[in-house]
Every structure is written in C-alpha cells, then in structure tokens.
Amino acid sequence: IPAGAQQQRKRRATPARSADAARHANKSAKVFNEIMRVPDRAIPRELIGGAEAVVVCPGVVKAAFIIGGRKGDCTVTRRTREGWGAPAFFNLAGGSFGAQIGAASTDFVLLIMNEEGLKGLLEDKFEIGGETGVAAGPVGREASASTNLTLDAGILSYSRSKGLFAGIALKGVAITPDNDLNRAYYAKTAKEVISENLRAPSPVRALSLALSRYSVK
C-alpha cells in the first residue's frame, strides 16, 4: 500500500463528520426502537434474528427531482456471531410508493433475509425489486401466517408514515453507499465495513444495541 494511502486510512474523522455519523446512527436507532415498542404492530423478532442485515432509513423525504420518488439517508447493519456489527452509511433514492405513502416524511426498514440480498448491498448501486425478490413484511401476529414469505423473498420491507407502520412492497429504489461518510468515519468503504464485521464504535452503537435487544433466533 502506498505511504499516502496508509496515512489516509490512519486519519481520524473530523469532529463534524463524526457528528454526522453519530446523528445518522442515532436517528436510525430511534426510529427502530419506536417501531418495536408496539408489539402488536412491530416487526416479528424472529425475522430480525434471522436476517442477514437490517437497513433503516429514517425521515426519507419527497424529492422534487425524482418523479413520485424520495431521497434519504440509511444505515445498514449486518448480523455477526457476536450480535450486530457497525453501521455502514448509505443513501436511498427513487421509488414507486403508491398513494399509501403520501406523507412528506416516511421511515423505511428493510430486512435482508439471505446472502443474495447481502451481496447486492455490497454493489456500488443496489436496486430493490431487481434480481432480489422483495415483499411487504409481516407485522405482529401476522408472522405465523407468513412463514413462506421469508422463503421466497430476499428482502422484507416496511414503512412508517403518519404514525402508521406496515409492510409495503417497496420497488424501484436504489441504495448506494455514502462512502464519503464511511471513509471519513471508518477510513473504510461501506463494503469493507459490512464485509469485515466491524464492531460498532461507541458513538454509533445505538442501532446495533437495539437490534440485539429485539432479535430472537
């Protein structure tokens, strides 16, 4: 590795970028905790425990430059042997959401249920609803009646809009790594953060802890 590259990787994030990373992770953790505190309408814990990774996109807003679409920031956390790893930072754009998602701000949660979906996340641009099957995720007690759903779908998707949380068939959405922020905070790309199963540093650990709290294997 050239000396310049070694120096680049050793640099610490600036206070501003560290604050950005912590803010993204904490917003994702807040949304996830709020969703899971309503057991009858929450994501079944067995599905969280069986997921390869979880994507949380808080406060995704309408984007005037995307017809019918939205844009926002996401965190992606992979399940590891010890629990849940460090959050990698991504962007979301596009999407065909239908009339049910008409609010100015919407939260999204995606469960990546298999290795194929996980590999997709490691690409430079991952289009949901492409080669990896996506389905509206079951909530609460619906899980027992939806066992076959997880066998067919690589991704289970959910949305929360105006206080209503439900599964939604999310399609036409592109998730791309925010490698400016990943490199600034970790000195690594999103792919490296996810592939290397990094432990979450304390300032961005809230989402990993929340996922551990609500996971059942």
Where are the language model's segments positioned?
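Small-residue-enriched, tightly packed secondary-structure blocks
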Residues: Q6-K217
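N-terminal export/membrane-targeting signals
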Residues: I1-A5
